[in-house]
Design a protein with these regions (language model features):
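Membrane-embedded alpha-helical bundles of polytopic integral membrane proteins
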Residues: 1-178, 182-206
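Functionally important transmembrane alpha-helices
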Residues: 212-218
Length: 218
């Protein structure tokens, strides 16, 4: 199976799940899809930064904590600040990872702790922000636009880069990325944003494209 076919299949699955979660306005579907994103995203982060290689159960616990953070912030965004007490167990988790780090290798402790906390912010934290947009029907289209534009940027960058790519964007970090691919992704993201929000808001597509590219390089 070619890389293009794989990207098309997974891209269609990704878009389909996101559309179902955001357009059906069914809280259960939304929570399942985005909770799955939080779990898998945190798990993948652990793989990327090589945390808990000797303790795989910690990966599961950290990924589950990201899902809980997403759920708790959804309840607060949906029902009000009175439900902020739902964050208490998550505060307990943060205390746990601080204590846990004490029993790690002393030399690696600061680095490992920073990786875990940043992963929670990078995945669980940013997905939790989505709750602010989702619970407000007037701004939920912005949330949809962000995810569709990210997919459009990735697809446009791949198609342009694989066919026209000549000038490397950042070869020391990502040898396959090119300026042509970046421009292709930028155009695709701007078009997607313009179609969903109106052309006067297409600057959002520029921001999304740049942020997505930097995120990949990071």
């Amino acid at each position: 199976m070619s890389n293009l076919v794989k990207r098309a299949i997974f891209g269609s699955l990704y878009v389909g799940l996101i559309l179902a979660a955001l357009l059906l306005r069914e809280h259960l579907v939304y929570m399942i899809v985005f909770g799955l994103l939080a779990f898998l995203g945190t798990w993948e982060w652990s793989n990327l930064v090589s945390t808990h290689r000797l303790f795989p159960l910690r990966r599961i616990f950290d990924a589950t904590a990201a899902v809980y953070l997403f759920w708790a912030t959804h309840e607060i965004a949906d029902k009000g600040i009175a439900y902020a007490a739902f964050l208490v167990p998550y505060a307990g988790y943060l205390l746990y990872i601080l204590v846990r780090s004490i029993y790690s290798e002393r030399q690696a402790m600061p680095t490992d702790l920073a990786k875990v906390i940043f992963g929670q912010i990078y995945v669980g934290g940013f997905l939790s922000i989505a709750n602010i947009f989702y619970t407000d029907t007037d701004t939920s289209i912005i949330l949809l636009t962000i995810f569709v534009s990210i997919w459009a940027n990735d697809t446009g960058a791949y198609l342009a880069g694989s066919t026209l790519g000549r000038h490397k964007l950042f070869p020391s970090v990502s040898p396959k990325k090119s300026w042509e691919g970046f421009l292709g992704g930028l155009i695709a993201a701007v078009v997607a944003t313009g179609l969903l929000l109106g052309w006067e808001q297409c600057y959002i597509g520029v921001i999304i494209s740049i942020a997505a590219t930097w995120g990949d390089l990071f």
